Amino acid sequence: MDKFPSVLLVTKTTGYQARSFGDAAAKLGVRLIFATDRCDHLEDPWRDHAIPVRFHDESYSVRTIFNELKRTPPAGVLAVGDRPMHLAASVTQVFGLQGNTVEAVGISRNKLATRQALKAAELPVPWFRAVSVDSDIVTL
């Protein structure tokens, strides 16, 4: 078992924010593990020891992450971006960690669904109504 807790960061290789997370993790004494959409045919092209994932193939990616981390599971999972967020929710579920559910992530990616969920939970939400893109703007 590692001396320091680890956190999995699911992100795109092009995400500039990843380095900021790395700096923060180092300051906190947390081992940051990357899961990125880097090329899985080259040997660690970014030299970050990232687990290669495919955002378009979630079941493959969840399996890959699980197989890589099952001996020393992460203490938490973070995500940067829409597609990484969905994968992170699935990984969180597989490891039995607390975090956003896949359903909640799906809702958060849709403004109407988000507002409906907030309203159903009796939380403050601005007035809204759903309209078709074909609606006559004058009659609205």
Named regions from a protein language model:
Residues 1-104, 132-135:
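ATP-binding N-terminal substructure of ATP-dependent carboxylate-amine bond-forming enzymes
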Residues 110-140:
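Active-site nucleotide/adenylate-binding loops and adjacent lid/helix of ATP-dependent enzymes
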